[in-house]
Amino acid sequence: MTQPIVVAALYKFVTLEDYAELREPLLKAMLDNGVKGTLLLANEGINGTVSATREGIDGLLTWLRSDPRLVDVDHKESYCDEQPFYRTKVKLKKEIVTLGVPGVDPNNAVGTYVEPKDWNALISDPEVLLIDTRNDYEVAIGTFKGAIDPKTETFREFPEYIKANFDPSKHKKVAMFCTGGIRCEKASSYMLGEGFEAVYHLKGGILKYFEEVPQEESLWDGDCFVFDNRVTVRHDLTEGEYDQCHACRHPVNAQDRASEHYSPGVSCPHCWDSLSEKTRRSAIDRQKQIELAKARNLPHPIGYNYKAEA
């Protein structure tokens, strides 16, 4: 029986002054353990999603936790039948999740972590303002009931959204969430700096909520977008039914694929009328390479799995 692939999303905000020197040893540890995916290193910590066999993931986590600074690195797991990644990378960044506001540091100030088992009670409080900190295309396919969608295209837009819409003197309790916990943790640090006092965020994010809260008790509605070839996962952490438009990154469902504006790998109903001619030509050329490689039974040229036709 084929061993399932373990997908591990991990992060930790911790000062890593030698983060540049960690790149090569970390890359070697990933390669030695057969781990695919991308990890980001910055002065503020580590972040990324990787996949491997059970032994491979355990080996990488053991290596990471041998560093006293990473002994309690947060991680959550899901499973799939095929490798969702085909490359192994370690990238050096200014931030492990890009907010773009100098001075925001979860290592110095952060909101109150809320365990998944306590999340439903918190967000059911009518005095709590519930904000989804993810991008618009992620929110569109699933979110918590009653959550506010900031309709941001990138996390960099989040600070301006908060300044334009909320007031610390009026909004006394704020709860936030994201896919794996990292974005809302940094958002909570920003909110505290803006004067909000009671700031909460979901520990481990949506994925940890899926892992620990029974589906019959769930307040989640829809699928959750993930940053790998699965595109989305359901509450039981199995792969969803969505594909992804590689022109605009928006998830596409069966209805989208039936649209006259959907062309596999080229455009979808969300972007067909906004793509530049250069982007469209590039997408067409890339799709031709993919179809040719598939016909010749060669590996996917840009590192994805071939999905069955819908």
Swiss-Prot record:
Its EC number is 1.14.-.-. GO terms for molecular function: oxidoreductase activity, acting on paired donors, with incorporation or reduction of molecular oxygen. SMART domains: RHOD. The keyword Protein biosynthesis does not apply. Signal peptide: none annotated. One of its GO terms (biological process) is tRNA modification. Keywords: Oxidoreductase, tRNA processing. Gene3D superfamilies: 3.30.70.100, Rhodanese-like domain (3.40.250.10). Catalyzes oxygen-dependent 5-hydroxyuridine (ho5U) modification at position 34 in tRNAs. This is tRNA uridine(34) hydroxylase. The gene is trhO.
